[in-house]
Regions:
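Non-catalytic DNA-recognition/assembly elements of restriction-modification systems
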Residues: 1-20, 149-157, 207-229, 358
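Amphipathic alpha-helical coiled-coil/heptad-repeat segments
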Residues: 1-5, 154-210, 362-417
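Short coil/turn segments at secondary-structure boundaries
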Residues: 24-31, 132-134, 233-240, 257-260, ...
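A short beta-sheet element
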Residues: 37, 51, 58-122, 246-247, ...
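A structural connector/turn signal
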Residues: 61-62, 137, 149, 210, ...
């Protein structure tokens, strides 16, 4: 049923596609005017991580293909990723560029508000309709014909503008939170570089002064009673039983049991005897595949066992504070070193445990380790809080889009007096 005052129309009643120009690869330069290609169009964002440039004078010679801040572009070839359309808006003055083939500019008609159209294009329902229209095509290409094969609810322009204003407010909140997350991550990286190397010493709460004393260089195997991994064989799965965790079940602070397969009581007990059950204060590390992607400390009893894709460190608590080591192995520089120097496997890369045991690390006293870990853990918690806030904002906006873009929820349009 069409909401009162709305019309069911083809998306082409709101906008048209203006395709880019077939610039030659031989025209490319090291600098000049940005060249917007299909690879630059992401889900809701323009990505300039792979910049290409054309001569400056092309802006005048091909001015009808010039893009500027505020323009909306969409990928024409393979236009969707999952249930999202590759559509984005140029948001900066520095986004000024020339439009390449296989990308189109969205040109709104008199019946379409540009911000409303942008929100419509970003909705899951719109991407779904595009995917349906492209079924069986190879390669899938977005065209006017595809757009003419389905209809969307089109409210009057004043209502379009009000809907767009509401959804744009959520976009701003999402963008602000994303920037805060990125800033917090950069701040934490800077803290890690200072605290985990001893360049910056924290205050010892017992003395009220900065920690003192030289840091000690040790081998990982000397400060851990175990440096091992989980089971090297995989028992038969059962419907109801104990979880058997692998790398795919790891998350930043623990296991996600919903993805784990389960094994029988007998197999579980046998693997417990083989020391495949983590204990409190153990440090678990992604050993195979996504090396060091996850590294966390076991904080409560785990009623499950681990496979060999997970490494287990059991620290000597008089030498090592577990959270300090977990933070140490989460450094990008350490991940890079381990990935390059301590792995094997032409297919799936794996940490070589005998080499891993011999890795040298510099550690301060346990009290200083605890203080460093507490500061970095607080930074992690701040990031986690912001990420939870971001997820909430995105979910709220998604629910609003489903209501507002279908007319299930109507808005009050401001009337000029």
């Amino acid at each position: 049923m069409v909401p009162d005052g709305w019309k069911n129309q083809s998306p082409t009643s709101l906008f048209k596609l203006f395709s880019g120009f077939a610039f030659k690869s031989t025209d490319a330069q090291e600098s000049g005017t940005k060249w917007l290609k299909i690879a630059n169009v992401g889900i809701g964002e323009i990505k300039w991580d792979a910049d290409s440039f054309l001569p400056e004078h092309f802006l005048l010679e091909h001015k009808k293909f010039a893009l500027s801040k505020g323009d909306i572009v969409v990928a024409l070839t393979r236009p969707t990723l999952g249930n999202k359309l590759k559509v984005a808006r140029l948001t900066k003055e520095s986004d000024t560029s020339l439009l390449n083939q296989r990308v189109a500019k969205i040109v709104c008609k008199d019946d379409g508000d540009s911000e409303f159209v942008f929100q419509l294009l970003r909705s899951d329902e719109f991407a779904y309709r595009i995917n349906v229209g492209l079924l069986g095509t190879d390669p899938p290409n977005l065209s006017v014909k595809v757009l003419e094969d389905f209809t969307v609810g089109c409210p009057p322009l004043p209502e379009q503008r009000k809907i767009a204003k509401i959804l744009s407010t959520w976009d701003k909140a999402i963008a602000t939170t994303e920037k805060l997350i990125e800033a917090s991550k950069q701040q934490k990286k800077a803290l890690m570089q200072q605290l985990l190397t001893g360049k910056k010493r924290l205050i010892n709460p017992e003395t009220g002064k900065a920690f003192e004393g030289e840091w000690e260089e040790v081998k990982l195997g000397d400060v851990c009673s175990k440096v091992t991994d989980g089971a090297h064989h995989s028992p038969q799965s059962v419907e109801v039983g104990y979880p058997m965790f692998s790398v795919k079940d790891m998350r930043s602070t623990g296991f996600f049991e919903n993805t784990a397969r389960h094994i029988s009581d007998g197999d579980f007990k046998a693997l417990v005897k083989q020391n495949c059950k983590p204990e409190i204060n153990d440090i678990l590390i992604a050993k195979d595949g996504s090396i060091l992607k996850y590294c966390f400390v076991v904080k409560e009893e785990v009623q499950g066992v681990i496979l060999s894709s997970i490494a287990l460190l059991r620290p000597k608590l008089n030498k090592i504070f577990p959270q300090f080591i977990a933070q140490y192995f989460s450094q990008d520089s350490v991940k890079f070193f381990v990935g390059k120097a301590l792995t094997s496997g032409s297919g799936v890369p794996r940490i070589i445990l005998k080499d891993f045991k011999g890795i040298h690390i510099r550690i301060p006293s346990v009290p200083e380790q605890q203080k460093i870990a507490s500061v970095l853990t607080a930074a992690d918690q701040e990031i986690e809080m912001l990420e939870a806030k971001l997820a909430h904002f995105k979910q709220e906006k998604k629910a609003l889009m489903q209501q507002l873009l279908t007319g299930k929820r109507r808005v009050t349009v401001d009337i000029d007096i």
